[in-house]
């Protein structure tokens, strides 16, 4: 059942340079990474937004909002997602962290001050619209580190099961899933 008042943002962009092909289209069981993430967000959120680069022409079964920048960094997708969200609270997940669960995302949302993230870094994370001005400023100034952009905000650290946070950057990483 979806949580009323929670937006889910799926970051489907990324150059996939080390991987060699779009990570969003890698299969895990019967689903691609993108399909799985979209489903998990749908289990939790009453609104879902996928953000990427329109020029990438990614073939996924849902609309992808162009992040509106030439920047290839997660901060661009987070800003675009927060701007488009109709809710004040958003969970943001990258497509290349395919083992995330509804429960893990719910824990991030429940703990969110301005931001809630695991100790490993700013994604996945929960972001309130109160974080948007700091993120927009960092992006406008070319400061592309999401971790640095949230440093001055009220950030909750949420310990999650590390096995859920496996990031797939190379074909060998898929075998660890």
Regions from the language model: what does each represent?
Residues 2-164, 171-172:
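Nucleotide and nucleotide-moiety/phosphate-recognizing core
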Residues 174-177:
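Short, charged, intrinsically disordered terminal tails
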């Amino acid at each position: 059942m979806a949580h009323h008042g929670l937006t889910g943002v799926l970051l489907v962009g990324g150059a996939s340079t080390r991987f060699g092909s779009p990570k969003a289209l890698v299969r895990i069981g019967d689903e691609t990474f993108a399909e799985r993430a979209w489903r998990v967000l749908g289990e939790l959120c009453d609104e879902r937004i996928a953000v990427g680069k329109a020029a990438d022409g990614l073939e996924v079964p849902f609309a992808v909002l162009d992040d509106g920048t030439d920047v290839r960094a997660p901060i661009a997708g987070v800003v675009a997602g927060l701007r488009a969200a109709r809710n004040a609270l958003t969970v943001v997940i990258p497509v290349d962290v395919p083992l995330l669960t509804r429960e893990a995302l719910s824990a991030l949302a429940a703990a969110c001050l301005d931001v809630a993230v695991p100790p490993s870094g700013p994604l996945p994370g929960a972001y309130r619209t109160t974080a948007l001005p700091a993120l927009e400023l960092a992006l406008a100034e070319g400061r592309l580190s999401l971790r640095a952009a949230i440093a001055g905000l009220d950030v909750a650290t949420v310990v999650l099961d590390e096995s859920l946070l496996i990031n797939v950057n190379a074909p060998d990483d898929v075998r660890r899933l």
